[in-house]
């Protein structure tokens, strides 16, 4: 074990002795809440042979808050592989794979880009609404290095138009309107640092997303639903004292106030059905701008976000699956982003991305452009599911916009499983309707109730009695109408034919009434049958007056009804009223 450690240590020493930093030019952009560092290294191979790896050093403070790091050959496309190594003398060490070995005596120029978060300290920590925000940046005038540096320079960019209160002097150095320049310094030994502090005005809103929960639901029926829950907090200088809406509106600084007033979220160009809401409901102070390659959602919260204030909201949209879901046979690949561009220079403390896949997927694999934590998979049951859908859970902390990159989820899914839910729904509704039909057509009672059955039959008989009464009433009305026509035509044959038709219809309905009254007597007793018999009695009184009525019609010389005719019409009307009363009393 000791031998292996000694060999590793010896290899590290040889690697450090193999390079010399001929020139280092570092630029620190501290104009926002994210400190963006771009360092151009010119290395010379002073070793005994070709070298394919070089070591980069950061201070432990930078490494502790490092969010993103990338490396590349200056002037060339593509990224170099970079990996973290054990620390040396209070410096964090990263190894860069150059891909192509560098010959002895040759030089290589590489550029290292860093994104460092939450290192700018507000000073003072509390300010009034009308005050500007000042912050302090702690760094080193010398670029941390494991190699001797021949020449180096550091440029710190501060906010445009902002005040520079102070900056540590390390000769040679100079302060300008919007930047501080340290160097050039020559022949700086390895591991040498020189702490400096820059105190300057920075009114960028230091708004942090403490949590971003992104939910991606994949459907093979043509849609991918995306929803994000975001919690924001302003971690800049806290607002000291009350907030005045009037002073806020009249502030001439406008967007240079240290508060988040509005921001633009960039969504994919195919995004549709966009919604944006908070705990209260939909927020109308937002607008959607369609661009050539994106959809911009301009969001204005219900209130500006000052230091110490927080808010949360939900934003969601739909995407066409043909743009992001690829297939070959039963193999599928989902390619989308781990998170969207929330707004410029956003810092996300914790990102949790969940991918809801269709039920019964198999052989799921995830490929990400950078390391993420893959949490245990979950199951989420939805409509018509039997076992629940698989949910992938990916997490990462300390996120910046540079992390908004595509990742890929591959899986297997059979076509028959896609048809299972529609067929299941069809079978369910078919079964439901079949049960309803069977239930409505059959009597499932164990034993019948004689009294209830008799009552039901009685109700049917009463209905038939009412129909017979209506039919006889219609026969009387037809006879009366024929009599009125006779007054105009004096056609005796038509009148006699109408009388015969009336008598036949009356006799048929009376026969029906007699049969129904007999049945009613059996089911409901003699009392009900006796009442029903009155229907025949009232009818007989009217029928006995038919001949006298017709004779009066034949003798009449006017179209108006005479005395005998009117008496007959009154008898018909009275008989119908009595019949209705009898039916109601049974």
Swiss-Prot record:
Residues 443-586 are cytoplasmic. GO terms for biological process: protein N-linked glycosylation; protein N-linked glycosylation via asparagine. Keywords: Endoplasmic reticulum, Membrane, Signal, Transmembrane, Transmembrane helix. The keyword Transit peptide does not apply. Pathway: Protein modification; protein glycosylation. Pfam families: Ribophorin_I. Component of the oligosaccharyltransferase (OST) complex. Belongs to the OST1 family. This is Dolichyl-diphosphooligosaccharide--protein glycosyltransferase subunit 1. It comes from Caenorhabditis elegans.
């Amino acid at each position: 074990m000791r031998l292996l450690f000694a060999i590793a240590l010896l290899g590290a020493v040889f690697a450090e002795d193999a390079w010399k930093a001929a020139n280092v030019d570092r630029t620190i952009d501290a104009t926002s809440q994210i400190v963006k560092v771009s360092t151009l290294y010119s290395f010379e191979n002073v070793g005994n042979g070709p070298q394919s790896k070089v070591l980069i050093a950061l201070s432990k403070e930078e490494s502790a808050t490092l969010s993103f790091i990338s490396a590349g050959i200056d002037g060339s496309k593509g990224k170099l592989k970079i990996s973290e190594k054990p620390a040396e003398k209070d410096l964090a060490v990263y190894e860069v794979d150059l891909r192509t070995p560098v010959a002895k005596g040759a030089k290589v120029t590489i550029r290292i880009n860093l994104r460092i978060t939450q290192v700018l300290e507000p000073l003072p920590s509390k300010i009034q609404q009308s005050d500007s925000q000042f912050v302090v940046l702690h760094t080193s005038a010398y670029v941390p290095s494991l190699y001797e540096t021949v020449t180096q320079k550091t440029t710190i960019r501060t906010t445009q138009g902002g005040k520079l209160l102070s900056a540590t002097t390390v000769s040679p150095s100079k302060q300008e309107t919007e930047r501080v320049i340290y160097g050039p310094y020559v022949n700086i030994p390895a591991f040498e640092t020189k702490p400096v502090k820059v105190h300057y005005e920075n009114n960028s809103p230091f708004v942090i997303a403490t949590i971003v929960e992104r939910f991606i639901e994949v459907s093979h029926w043509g849609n991918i639903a995306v929803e994000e829950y975001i919690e924001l907090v302003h971690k800049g200088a806290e607002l000291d004292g009350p907030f005045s809406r009037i002073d806020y509106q009249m502030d001439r600084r406008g967007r240079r106030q240290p508060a988040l007033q509005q921001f633009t979220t960039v969504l994919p160009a195919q995004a549709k059905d966009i919604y944006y809401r908070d705990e209260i409901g939909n927020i109308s102070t937002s607008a959607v701008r369609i661009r050539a390659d994106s959809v911009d959602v301009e969001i204005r919260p219900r209130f500006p976000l000052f230091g110490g204030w927080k808010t949360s909201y939900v934003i969601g949209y739909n995407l066409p699956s043909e743009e992001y879901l690829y297939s070959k046979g039963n193999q599928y690949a989902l390619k989308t982003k781990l998170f969207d561009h929330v707004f410029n220079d956003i810092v996300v403390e914790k990102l949790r991305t969940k991918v809801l896949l269709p039920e019964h997927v198999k052989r799921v694999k995830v490929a990400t452009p950078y390391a993420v934590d893959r949490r245990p998979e979950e199951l989420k049951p939805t409509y018509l599911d039997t076992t629940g859908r698989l949910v992938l859970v990916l997490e990462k902390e300390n996120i910046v916009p540079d992390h908004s990159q595509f990742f890929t989820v591959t899986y297997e899914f059979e076509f028959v499983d896609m048809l299972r839910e529609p067929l299941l729904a069809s079978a369910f509704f078919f079964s439901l309707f079949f049960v309803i039909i069977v239930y409505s057509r059959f009597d499932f009672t164990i034993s019948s109730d004689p009294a209830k059955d008799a009552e039901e039959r009685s109700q049917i008989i009463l209905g038939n009695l009412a129909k017979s009464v209506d039919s006889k009433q219609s026969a009387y009305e037809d006879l009366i109408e024929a009599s009125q026509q006779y007054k105009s035509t004096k056609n005796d044959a038509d009148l006699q034919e109408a009388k015969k038709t009336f008598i036949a219809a009356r006799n048929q309905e009376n026969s029906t009434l007699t049969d129904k009254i007999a049945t009613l007597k059996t089911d409901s007793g003699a009392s009900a049958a006796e009442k029903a018999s009155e229907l025949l009695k009232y009818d007989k009184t009217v029928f006995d007056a038919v001949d006298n009525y017709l004779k009066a019609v034949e003798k009449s010389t006017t179209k108006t009804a005479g005395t005998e005719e009117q008496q007959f019409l009154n008898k018909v009307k009275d008989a119908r009223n009595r019949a209705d009363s009898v039916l109601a009393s049974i």
